[in-house]
């Protein structure tokens, strides 16, 4: 009877069973750091300073505004909308920001899982179906307003993370 693989497995078992979970505080700190990085990237794009995140622009109502109280699921949904908008923009300025939003959403999913509240998958939003028409009419305005509002939303999220948001 050959027990080689069994002995190897038993010998490795203590190492395999000692998997240390990433402390949730580390995930929360990484989330805050990534938010600050994205805000800095937006600040580096000079034309985003010309529009207030609270300003209303006709035809761009589908771009989320500021929310005083954000749950983790609302944060994820908001980031998904921004990510869809940014990936539709042809500007090279927003490619890295869009990638950062994907990473930020992954971190939010980890935070939600740590609270036993997995976030539902966000599907394509109907309000963004008209995005192509809006982009043809006002590409520059869409980019400026989206980045400005994203920056405001990220700053709200940063404040909410300090308050330990719910599901």
UniProtKB/Swiss-Prot annotation:
Pfam families: Leptin
Domain of life: Eukaryota
Signal sequence range: 1-21
Regions crossing the membrane: none
Disulphides: 117-167
Ribosomal protein found in the keyword field: no
Entry similarity comment: Belongs to the leptin family.
Purpose of the protein: Key player in the regulation of energy balance and body weight control. Once released into the circulation, has central and peripheral effects by binding LEPR, found in many tissues, which results in the activation of several major signaling pathways. In the hypothalamus, acts as an appetite-regulating factor that induces a decrease in food intake and an increase in energy consumption by inducing anorexinogenic factors and suppressing orexigenic neuropeptides, also regulates bone mass and secretion of hypothalamo-pituitary-adrenal hormones.
The protein, known as: Leptin
Species of provenance: Bubalus bubalis (Domestic water buffalo)
Gene name tied to this protein: LEP
């Amino acid at each position: 009877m050959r027990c080689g693989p069994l002995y190897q497995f038993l010998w490795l078992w203590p190492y395999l069973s000692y998997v240390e979970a990433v402390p949730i505080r580390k995930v929360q700190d990484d989330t805050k750091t990534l938010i600050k990085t994205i805000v800095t990237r937006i600040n580096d794009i000079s034309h985003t300073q010309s529009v207030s995140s609270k300003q209303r622009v006709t035809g761009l109502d589908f771009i989320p505004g500021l929310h005083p109280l954000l749950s983790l699921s609302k944060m994820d949904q908001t980031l998904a909308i921004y990510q869809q908008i940014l990936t539709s923009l042809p500007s090279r300025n927003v490619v890295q920001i869009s990638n950062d939003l994907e990473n930020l959403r992954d971190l939010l999913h980890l935070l939600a899982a740590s609270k036993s509240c997995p976030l539902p998958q966000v599907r394509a939003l109907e309000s963004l179906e008209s995005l192509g028409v809006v982009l043809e009419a006002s590409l520059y305005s869409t980019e400026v307003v989206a980045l400005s509002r994203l920056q405001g939303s990220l700053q709200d999220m940063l404040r909410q993370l300090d308050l330990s948001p719910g599901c």
